Amino acid sequence: MKHNPMVGEKLYIYTPCYDMWVSDVRRPYTVEAVNGNTITIREARPVFLGVCYYDTLPDYIEDDPNGARLKFRWSEKKQRWQESPAHSYPRVAVFGRWDWQPYLN
């Protein structure tokens, strides 16, 4: 079921790795803009986005002095918000679970 986020709403990002989910943020992102089936999210500071255990190199995003900004698009096929453009293991936006941070303290 599609979650229709609102500007200002918080979320976590997860990276599906084979059969496990790896948390790759230590605090929530915030929805900055909503445009149909695309959302733009922002972190308040430049961040390192986690890496699947099976990847060889970590996946960094640009060091934006205004904070990290990422775009996510709704996937009808997978019924989830995922990073756009998608990578091999596209990051997934998870709403309503801000206090759950598996593998990271």
Question: What is each stretch, according to the model?
Answer:
Residues 18, 46-47:
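Residue-level signature for short turns and capping positions that connect secondary-structure elements
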Residues 47-105:
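Intrinsically disordered, low-complexity, charged/polar segments
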Residues 2-22:
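Short coil-to-beta transition motif at edge beta-strands of beta-rich domains
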Residues 8-10, 28, 38:
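Exposed beta-strand and adjacent loop surfaces of beta-rich binding modules
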Residues 23-26, 66:
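Residues that act as N-cap/strand-start positions at coil-to-secondary-structure junctions
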Residues 25-34:
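Short beta-strand-centered aromatic/proline hotspots
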Residues 37-44:
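Short, solvent-exposed secondary-structure boundary/capping segments
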Residues 33-36, 74:
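Generic beta-strand structural signal
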